[in-house]
Amino acid sequence: MKIERINDWFARQGRWMVQKRWLVLSLFILVFAIGFTGLRYFKVSASWENYFLEDDPMLVKTKEFKDIFGNDNFAAVLTQCDNSFMKENLELIRELTNEMMDSISYADKITSLTDIEFMVGNEEGMTIEQIVPDLIPTDAASLETIRRKAYMKPHIAERLVSKDGTLSWIILKLRTFPKDSVWNKGKNAVSPEVLTGNELEHIITKDKYQKLHPKGTGLPYVTAMKMKWIGKEMPRVMGIAALVSILILLLITRSLRGVVVPLITAAGSIVIVYGLLGYVGMTIDSGMMMIPMLLAFAVSIAYNIHIFSYFKRQFLLHGERRRAVEETVGEMGWPVLFSALTTFAALLSFLAIPMQPMRFIGIATSSCVMLAFFIAITLMPVLLSFGKNGKPHPKVQETGGRWLDHQLGRLGESVLRHGTLILWIAGLLTAALIYQFTKIETAFDIERTMGRKIAYVNNLLEVGESELGSIYTYDVMIDLPEDGLTKSPAMLVRLDSLAQKAEGYKLTKRTTTVLNILKDLNQTLHEGDAAYYRIPTNPEEVAQLLLLYENAGGSEAEYWIDYDYRRLRLMVEISSFDSGEVERELNDIAANAARLFPEASVTTVGSIPQFTVMMQYVAR
């Protein structure tokens, strides 16, 4: 009796909708217009930091790091030519270096073959000069002198130019990006991360630099290229989804209304939900934007097919259009609502994951499902109510249904007869699938998740596989208990041990610390003797070296040691991303840092730790 009362209630609503069909259509158009207007406030982000909630420990640690050392992101370019030490190539590398520094909005400090702090000893101690002079010579002897100078210090050369001289590496440090509240204004706001990547792409694609075959890298560049690719791919994917939907609807409904209304339902639910999210100021991750759209298409087709099929059956039985609409809403309202509610509840489970994109999926997909239901149960019946009555179909009237109705009925009877067997088969399949489910690996590796057929992914992977280039980085910040401790040779030796440990990892391309400067300076002051490429043995000597470096105009050290001489930074560049290996290496470097510096606070930050934490949130 209870289900009959529910069906009666839905039937009354169906009767009311038919009577007030123009009002129902007007309300739908009004709500659609409100949602469409809200799309102007719709903001798409590709920042990895936006994956985390505001109070997430990872964001707190990252903010602390940036307050001390600045931006942990970088933008870089790998160049490739026959000989980097030819005059025209050196001029192009210098021009590219200067343009990156001048034209990228958040540029801070750049290092390249033509712009580097190259320390040379003199009578006063040492001076900082360039490997490549301001006026690049044309004669072979002078160019060979530049080559010899570039390779004079192997620890410098391995960061700038390949052994055969065909590759060069340009790396740009970036100023700290402002908070979202600073830039996220207006309808065409672009995040600093994407802006930086777009500016780099604009520079390296200029015709004048193509002789260098420049390839960009760095997280801002990866993010911008991802946004650009999604912007091109999304219309194609949605177009394919719409085409497949139309073909399915044509095959099943064979009716114009049966094709158009589900598409309106899908588009309406997407526009209204995304518009409302725009009004409330929710930022949407570019990689997740299509998921609610595709789900909206799927449920819109399913719900409307149920409604249309039942209407068509009833209409063929007695030919009374409005009566068929009322019967359809009465009989299909509760089953479709129940289906929508279960899907809605399941999708809300995404809200339990402490990540912004997952919560967006939970909110957007569940909202699209419920809106698709409301639009389907109102718009489809209302539009079906327009038109003349028809004559009952003799065969349908005689048999009580169409051929497919009878076949599905027989299938149901067969299921009931073989219930035990079906349960056993379902149980075995479920057990097998649960076992296979344990083999699923959560990964952010662009090669495995996107593939080399995508041009920008292939370029990035080639950069990582090259002798010089890297794609991602992570940082280890060591916060010692007292100011001045970072001048202690004992602490610096521990830092050196940690860097050497990191260099032994499978994924590490290179490491950078303040020791690169101190060791180089110590060697320079001892007439370039390679035996002195080491850490000084007493604190006073360390302090004198740092003072001499600053007086000579050096500024690189401030990125690796703080002004209070309390905190040290180790940056590790990696060439590729292997989820399991990265997590193992991060855990190992953190454990070794804690062992070497038991009295210090050790923090790992950067894109790689963020990816790892995200995988843990999703998978565990």
What are these regions (language model features)?
Residues S26, Y279, S300-S309, G333-A352, ...:
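Transmembrane alpha-helices and their membrane-interface boundaries in multi-pass membrane transporters
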Residues D67, P137-S255, V493, Q544-R620:
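Extracytoplasmic
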Residues G231-I284, A352-Q356:
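Interfacial segments of transmembrane alpha-helices in multi-pass membrane proteins
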Residues L39-F85, L90, A140, E144-V161, ...:
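Solvent-exposed, non-transmembrane loop/terminal regulatory segments of multi-pass membrane proteins
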Residues Q314-L341:
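Helix-loop junctions and hydrophobic alpha-helical segments within the transmembrane domains
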Residues R410, S414, H418-P539:
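Juxtamembrane segments of multi-pass membrane proteins
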Residues M1-F28, E326, F374-T430:
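Interfacial helix-loop-helix hairpins and adjacent transmembrane helices
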Residues E49-L53, S255-T265, V280-A296, F350-C368, ...:
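Membrane-water interface of transmembrane alpha-helices in multipass transporters/channels
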